[in-house]
Amino acid sequence: MSAYLKNYEELLFDFPAPRVLRITMGDPERLTPVSGKMHAEMVTIWNDIDADEDISAVILTGGKKAFSAGGDFALVEKSMSDFHFRMQTWKETRSLVYNVINCNKPIISAIRGPAVGAGLVCGLLSDVSIASKNARIIDGHPRLGVAAGDVSAIIWPLHCG
């Protein structure tokens, strides 16, 4: 395993086949909420993968119950109450979109269960998105009183036609 992968704490890695990296977002036994730390890791991992000559393809997956549960409550609360943190998170989200799109390795997302938030962004921006019969694509913004309009709201209709 590439040494830099050990620097990531909230993303889990394994190689199901030679040169194929599988990324599991968070604890596979939980609903995979995205913490501030995981959000930051999701931004930087794509540049690391792109530069890694030992990786030819990526599979992105979540836990057994959910692909991604969206931002954890601490992340959401801090984003709502701390202007500077909110601006940092928005910048990270912009970088997340660019980094996934600019990664030259094929990315395949395996979406099972609910898919919300930053995990959903990565899933929908993947080169190939495979959704199970129980996959649910959810924009959680309206539930928080926030207008829908992140990249998920833009990219999903483009995928569906």
Say what each PLM segment does.
Residues 32, 72, 113, 119:
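Conserved phosphate-binding and hydrolysis motifs of nucleotide-dependent enzymes
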Residues 96-102, 110, 116-161:
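CoA-thioester-processing core
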